Amino acid sequence: MVTTAEKTNIGYITQIIGPVVDVKFPGGKLPQIYNALKIVGTNESGQEINITVEVQQLLGDNQVRTVAMSSTEGLVRGFEVTDTGAPITVPVGKATLGRIFNVLGEPVDNRGPVNAEASLPIHRSAPKFTDLETKPSVFETGIKVVDLLTPYRRGGKIGLFGGAGVGKTVIMMELINNIATQHGGVSVFAGVGERTREGNDLYNEMIESGVINNENLNESKIALVYGQMNEPPGARMRVGLSGLTVAEYFRDVNKQDVLLFIDNIFRFVQAGSEVSALLGRMPSAVGYQPTLGTDVGELQERITSTTEGSITSIQAVYVPADDLTDPAPATTFAHLDGTTVLSRGLAAKGIYPAVDPLGSTSTMLQPNIVGDEHYNTARAVQSTLQRYKELQDIIAILGLDELSEEDRLIVARARKVERFLSQPFFVAEVFTGSPGKYVKLEDTIKGFQKILSGELDALPEQAFYLVGDINEAIAKAEKIKG
């Protein structure tokens, strides 16, 4: 770690504007950009102060401008500030599994201190170009619509795009559950500016499902790093980096395949824009920070696969007002290998997961990667749904009877396909009352082939709603007829 001074370097606060704190240091003893500074003491009203701030700008006149990682309430001008001589560091390694940390790597789950084998700074360089792994392989999730139409890349970056309340967090929780039970790898979850209640629910569900082993934390499969909605923007801006640092250690030192979940990448951008104006930067398009591309790039370029191990990242991206051209989601798009777009229209129909089969994409859906059978089935599903979409206006105006025999058949099959793309989730059992289902890729492909070939034309469409594989749909149809 880089130190900026041989002995303790002490300055004092000259100005406080919300989460932004200006600090003056003695001549020639300025801390470096991104160094962590500590403010510890008691103010005049007897309030204990223990705040970490991060250097963002060198202002001249021996002053630095910093952003606080916790509330600046109770701070006053003249308070002493100590330069730690290094960036914020967080504990890493096996000891982090089953624990919840804040942005500074402090445990917040009332389980005592963490005996970590190492601590690493949250600001690090991306892996060298020559160290990157480029062989594409598919990552099975057990979710039909994802595996068929937007297959995820092992070591890739996937975005879950959707407006408020369409199910981003639920899909993410299902993926964590499926991966922990089916693949057995380690995961890191970074909660960036989302609801504290959701963070708490996620933690409790993981204990229930055994992903976090309460009796023996070392056997847990996930480490959690939270910087929730009520935290100041500094914490929300950096908590993604703290989570990523934990994941990088598992990849680089333990040589493991890691899953990194970030919920929500938009809040990371939003925190940056909150801080940006206070740092005196001119806002850019729609009020975002002018450094939007750089901020997102610094985070995304570190999430990658090397020859030692991989980080597969699944990132929820809130889409403001359902507008995918907003600068925040649009900038994120450029970094992703796959996009899973959630549709409010499908959610309104009660089709969950509400993944838009025509709007979602994946660089993996190529015959030389997934094979001809998978590719042709996926494309046939999409063209059937596309034709159904084109016919909907005619149906709305003239009714089904005015369609040709062939088109009526396409509509009937498309409605079955649409319903078969829904699936009961393990993490949603409490709400739906249906047990969750993990569907293997070959069963998914077989099921859709049977629907499209006309083999199941006689079955009612409701038999395909919220089931696992095609055999369940056939059994459900028997039940309905019976």
From Swiss-Prot:
One of its GO terms (molecular function) is proton-transporting ATP synthase activity, rotational mechanism. Keywords: ATP synthesis, ATP-binding, CF(1), Hydrogen ion transport, Ion transport, Membrane, Nucleotide-binding, Thylakoid, Translocase, Transport. Its EC number is 7.1.2.2. The keyword Glycoprotein does not apply. Coiled coil: none annotated. It comes from the Bacteria. It holds the Pfam family ATP-synt_ab_N. Its main location: membrane. PROSITE patterns: ATPASE_ALPHA_BETA. One of its GO terms (cellular component) is proton-transporting ATP synthase complex. It is a peripheral membrane protein. It catalyses: ATP + H2O + 4 H(+)(in) = ADP + phosphate + 5 H(+)(out). Signal peptide: none annotated. ATP binds at residues 162-169. It is found in: Cellular thylakoid membrane. Belongs to the ATPase alpha/beta chains family. PANTHER family: ATP SYNTHASE (PTHR15184), ATP SYNTHASE SUBUNIT BETA, MITOCHONDRIAL (PTHR15184:SF71). Produces ATP from ADP in the presence of a proton gradient across the membrane. The catalytic sites are hosted primarily by the beta subunits. F-type ATPases have 2 components, CF(1) - the catalytic core - and CF(0) - the membrane proton channel. CF(1) has five subunits: alpha(3), beta(3), gamma(1), delta(1), epsilon(1). CF(0) has four main subunits: a(1), b(1), b'(1) and c(9-12). This is ATP synthase subunit beta. The gene is atpD.
